[in-house]
Design a protein with these regions (language model features):
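Glycine/serine-rich phosphate-binding loop and adjoining beta1-alpha1 elements at the start
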Residues: 1-31, 37, 107-198, 327
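An N-terminal-biased, well-structured beta-alpha scaffold segment characteristic
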Residues: 17-135, 139-141
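Glycine-rich phosphate/diphosphate-binding loop of Rossmann-like nucleotide-binding domains
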Residues: 35-36, 40-70, 181-266
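Glycine/threonine-rich flexible loop motifs
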Residues: 41-46, 108-112, 271-279, 303-308
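A structured beta-alpha segment of the ubiquitous adenosine-cofactor-binding alpha/beta core
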Residues: 83-94, 105, 246-262, 268-285, ...
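Rossmann-fold NAD(P) dinucleotide-binding segment
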Residues: 101-126, 259-260, 273-293
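Rossmann-fold NAD(P)-binding glycine/threonine-rich loop
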Residues: 126-153, 282-326
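Adenosine-phosphate binding glycine-rich loop
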Residues: 147-173, 177-188, 303-405
Length: 405
C-alpha cells in the first residue's frame, strides 16, 4: 500500500522564528568601604593592596579607613599607591554601598550601617546575637558570611584557608613553648639523629588536624591522630600519602597516649554548637610536666576540660604543670598571611559580581555565591540561624523569583 503524499498549499511559506535570548547584564561599578577593625584581637584586613589595585584598575572604587591595614603590616601609603581612597572619616567609609569587614558585625557597627547596604564579613556563629540580626533586618541589609561562601569544588575556601593557618601555626606555637626554658621542657619539636622524636597527639582529623599533622611530620615528630569519624581518618591518610597512626576517640587509649606526649592539639569541629570535651582534667593531670596543650577549638568551647580562653597578649597559662594555649582566632595572630588568603577569595568574587551586573543579577546564576547569603534585603535566609534565634526564615530562591530583574 503506497503512502499518500501530503498536499501542501501554494500559500504555505517558511518564516524565521525569533529566538528569545537573555540580554547580558551590563557590568556594574562597585563602591567598596573597608573600615578599621576595632574588634578584640582582630588584626586582619579583607583586601590587601594588590587586590585593591586590581579592583581599581577595573573601574571600581575602594575607600579604606586610615590605618585599617596597620595590624597586617600594610600602610596607608601601600593602599594609596594601589589606588584606594584613604580617609580618617569613618562615616565616609560606611557610606559606601558595599562594606567588607574582616571581623563579624558587632553592636557598635549597627548605627553606622545604612539602609540597603551589602555587608561581607565573618558571621562567628558562637558570638552572634539576635539583636544584631534584627537590626540588620530593620535596615534591609544584604549580608554574606565568610564561612558560607563556597567554591566550585564544594568546599568553603575562606574557612579552609583559616583552618590551614591555624593547624600549621599550632605546631609552630607548640614548638616555641616546648623550647621555653622557664616552664617548657626545653626540647626541640621534631627529632634529630640519635634522639627520639617528640610525640604529638592531634585530636581531630579535619582541615586543622590535617594541617597540624603535616607540619608536625615535616618537623620530624611522631604523630598520632584521634577522631570519631573513620572516613576523616581515612581521608587524612590518603591526603598525606603516609600511614600515620590513627584511632577513634576511645578514652582509655587516648589517656594512655596523652601520658607520654610532649604536645597535644585539640582540632575538633562541630557544625552546631559546642565541641565535646574529650580530654578530662584527670587526663591532663597525668600528662608530663612541661608538655603543651594547643586548643584550637577554644572558640567553640574547647575539647580539653582544663581549657580557658586566653589572648594574643597573654596567650598561655599553667595548670597541672601543663602549658595551655587557648587563643581563639589563631589566624589573626598571623594577620598578613590570613589577610592574603581572604583577599584571594574575595577579589575574584567581587570582579565576577561586577562583570555580571551586580550582586542581585549574579545571584541568579551563581549558586556558590547564593550559599553565602544569610540575609537578603532584610529577610533571614539561613535556616540554621532562623532555628537558633527563633526568627522567621524565608527561602532565598523564593525572594529571587519574586524580585524584579
Amino acid at each position: 500500500m503506497s503512502a499518500t503524499k501530503p498536499i501542501i498549499s501554494s500559500a504555505f511559506h517558511y518564516a524565521t522564528e525569533t529566538e528569545m535570548l537573555e540580554i547580558k547584564q551590563k557590568s556594574a561599578k562597585l563602591a567598596i568601604g573597608i573600615p578599621k577593625e576595632t574588634a578584640y584581637q582582630e588584626n586582619r584586613i579583607a583586601l590587601i593592596p594588590e587586590a585593591v589595585s586590581v579592583l581599581v584598575n577595573n573601574g571600581h572604587q575602594v575607600t579604606i579607613e586610615s590605618k585599617a591595614g596597620e595590624n597586617s603590616k600594610y600602610s596607608d601609603r601601600d593602599y594609596s599607591e594601589a589606588g584606594a581612597v584613604i580617609t580618617c572619616d569613618e562615616e565616609e567609609v560606611f557610606k559606601q554601598p558595599v562594606i567588607i569587614k574582616s571581623a563579624s558585625i558587632h553592636t557598635a557597627d549597627l548605627p553606622k550601617l545604612k539602609h540597603n547596604q551589602t555587608v561581607i564579613s565573618p558571621i562567628n556563629f558562637s558570638l552572634l546575637k539576635k539583636e544584631i540580626l534584627e537590626a540588620l533586618a530593620a535596615k534591609k541589609i544584604t549580608a554574606l558570611g565568610f564561612e558560607l561562601l563556597r567554591d566550585d569544588s564544594g568546599t568553603f575556601p575562606i574557612v579552609r584557608s583559616m583552618s590551614e593557618i591555624a593547624g600549621s601555626a599550632a605546631m609552630l606555637l607548640a614548638g616555641q613553648f616546648l623550647a621555653c626554658s622557664d616552664v617548657g621542657k626545653g626540647v626541640l619539636l621534631g627529632g634529630i639523629s640519635g634522639v627520639p622524636p617528640t610525640k604529638v597527639i592531634i585530636i581531630g582529623a579535619g582541615i586543622v588536624g590535617e594541617s597540624a599533622t603535616r607540619a608536625a611530620l615535616a618537623m620530624g615528630a611522631s604523630v598520632k591522630v584521634f577522631d570519631n569519624n573513620v572516613y576523616r581518618l581515612k581521608r587524612l591518610q590518603n591526603n598525606l600519602g603516609y600511614p600515620v597512626w590513627t584511632s577513634v576517640i576511645e578514652p582509655n587509649i587516648l589517656a594512655k597516649q596523652l601520658k607520654t606526649c610532649e604536645a597535644a592539639v585539640g582540632a575538633l569541629n562541630s557544625e552546631k554548637g559546642r565541641v565535646p570535651v574529650v580530654v578530662t582534667e584527670a587526663m591532663v593531670e597525668r600528662m608530663r610536666p612541661g608538655s603543651v596543650i594547643i586548643d584550637v577549638c577554644i572558640d567553640r568551647g574547647g575539647c580539653f576540660e582544663t581549657s580557658e580562653i586566653t589572648s594574643h597578649e597573654h596567650p598561655t597559662f599553667l595548670k597541672h604543670d601543663v602549658i595551655h594555649y587557648c587563643v581563639p582566632n589563631i589566624a589573626s595572630g598571623f594577620a598578613r598571611t590570613a589577610s592574603h588568603a581572604i583577599s584571594n577569595v574575595l577579589m575574584p568574587m567581587l570582579l565576577k559580581v561586577a562583570d555580571n551586573g551586580g550582586l542581585d543579577a549574579m545571584l541568579w546564576y551563581d549558586f556558590n555565591l547564593r550559599n553565602g547569603i544569610y540575609m537578603y534585603k532584610g529577610h533571614l535566609t539561613n535556616i540554621y540561624l532562623s532555628e537558633n534565634f527563633d526568627m522567621k526564615y524565608t527561602d532565598l530562591n523564593l525572594l529571587l523569583a519574586t524580585s524584579s530583574r
